[in-house]
């Protein structure tokens, strides 16, 4: 298991790998998720005694809310939303820096 700075480095490495290959990653770590270009949420629910799994694409707002949920659980607040927005912004800055390298 990784968290904190180690999770951040894993996310950065996955992004660098994605520059030459397609990467699909399932994670509960916001540090890794923030690096992604596309986001999906996987939801499981029971209907009529059967379990169904749905994979739903997230738009910009959905991405922000899902990262906030990873930070703070179901209690999404202005603070968790701000933290998620900052993490997305920091990831974008890192990605731009890497793309500019020769």
Where are these regions (language model features)?
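ABC ATPase nucleotide-binding domain "signature" loop
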Residues: 1-2
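C-terminal lobe/lid and adjacent interdomain/linker elements of RecA-like ASCE P-loop ATPase modules
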Residues: 5-102
């Amino acid at each position: 298991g990784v968290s904190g700075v180690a999770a951040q480095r894993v996310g950065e490495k996955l992004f660098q790998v994605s520059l030459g290959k397609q990467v699909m990653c399932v994670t509960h770590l916001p540090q890794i998720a923030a690096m992604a270009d596309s986001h999906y949420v996987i939801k499981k629910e029971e209907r009529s005694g059967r379990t169904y799994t749905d994979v739903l694409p997230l738009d910009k707002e959905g991405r922000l809310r899902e990262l906030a949920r990873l930070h703070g659980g179901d209690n999404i607040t202005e603070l968790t939303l701000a933290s998620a927005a900052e993490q997305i912004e920091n990831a974008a800055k890192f990605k731009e820096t890497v793309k500019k390298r020769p």
